[in-house]
Regions:
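Glycine/proline-rich loop-helix segments at beta-alpha junctions forming the active-site rim
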Residues: 1-44
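Residue-level marker for buried hydrophobic side chains located in beta-strands
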Residues: 5, 74-76, 156
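DnaQ-like (DEDDh/DEDDy) 3′-5′ exonuclease domain used for proofreading
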Residues: 31-74
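Gly/Thr-rich phosphate-binding beta-strand-loop-beta motif of the actin/hexokinase/Hsp70
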Residues: 64-91
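Extended, well-ordered alpha-helical scaffold/bundle regions in very large, multi-domain proteins
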Residues: 235-244, 262-263
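Basic polycationic patches enriched in arginine
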Residues: 253-254
Length: 263
């Protein structure tokens, strides 16, 4: 049995008057119609590369660089713990990404020399003017990498949060809302929040969370840009200015009173 949660239609009619629920209900009903065509749960098969060794990591970063130079937008996401980059994710398609961890339960994941080489490879991608980058709340990642490592993002930089807020200004623009609207990925943001706030979950869950955060923007941004590029109907011309009213006519003069009768 497949279930799609949705707001009750009565929430956008009197007395609720929550009109913003109407387009959300419409989208959910369209999704329900699509899902009713088959019994199975069908989602895109996605791959998040975790626990890669140094050589595998460098090879994947070189692959990202080549694809980026060919026109593929590259997703970037960093996870910061106590002011340090805990892991960094890169996505190069709607179904492929890597999480590069810098620590795990045993301490540092890479040696200092390996970590330096990895960050230089990441910098080559981020600083290349011919490679388009995208991220969720990308302004945070960009300023952090600039101040912490001196990595200056160049080229086309896209942010799903900004694109979402311009496209749909009345609705949430976080990555959870973007994921729901533009992908078939189930809700996963709680995994990262629980890991950060309560330390619950496994390292694998944390790295998968980072990989999804780098992957989702790659799938979402083309759809968001399509909405932004749609021609909007022009505003109707203002009504013509009515001619000025003529000045009112002066009231007619009363005739003089008749002369008095003779005595």
């Amino acid at each position: 049995l497949k279930v799609i949660p949705a707001f009750h239609p009565a929430t956008f009619i009197p007395p609720k008057f929550n009109f913003l629920n109407k387009p959300i209900i419409y989208e959910d009903l369209m999704r329900a119609k699509y899902e009713s065509q088959f019994k199975d749960i069908k989602r895109l098969s996605r791959t998040i590369h975790t626990r890669c060794d140094f050589n595998q990591t460098i090879n994947i970063l070189k692959h990202c660089y080549r694809l980026g130079r060919l026109g593929q937008v590259i997703g970037i996401d960093i996870e910061v713990i106590n002011g340090e980059v805990d892991c960094i994710g890169l996505g190069w398609s709607p179904v492929d990404s890597i999480c590069i961890p810098f620590r795990f339960s045993g301490g540092d994941y890479f040696t200092v020399e390996e970590e330096l080489s990895i960050m230089r490879a990441v910098a080559f991608i981020i600083q290349d003017e011919d490679i388009a980058k995208v991220g969720a709340t990308f302004i945070f990642d960009a300023q952090f990498l600039l101040h912490k490592y001196g990595i200056r993002p160049r080229g086309s930089l896209h942010c799903t949060q900004i694109a979402q807020k311009i496209s749909y200004p009345d609705f949430p623009a976080g990555l959870d809302a973007v994921t729901t609207m533009h992908t078939d990925i189930p809700y996963y943001k709680a995994d990262g929040k629980q890991w950060i706030k309560m330390g619950s979950g496994t390292w694998e869950q944390w790295w998968n969370y980072n990989g999804l955060d780098a992957m989702v923007p790659v799938e979402a941004i083309p759809k968001q840009l399509e909405v932004l590029r749609k021609p909007h109907p022009p505003h109707p011309p203002p009504p013509p200015t009515p001619p000025p009213h003529p000045p009112p006519h002066p009231p007619p003069r009363r005739p003089p009173p008749p002369p008095p009768p003779p005595p």
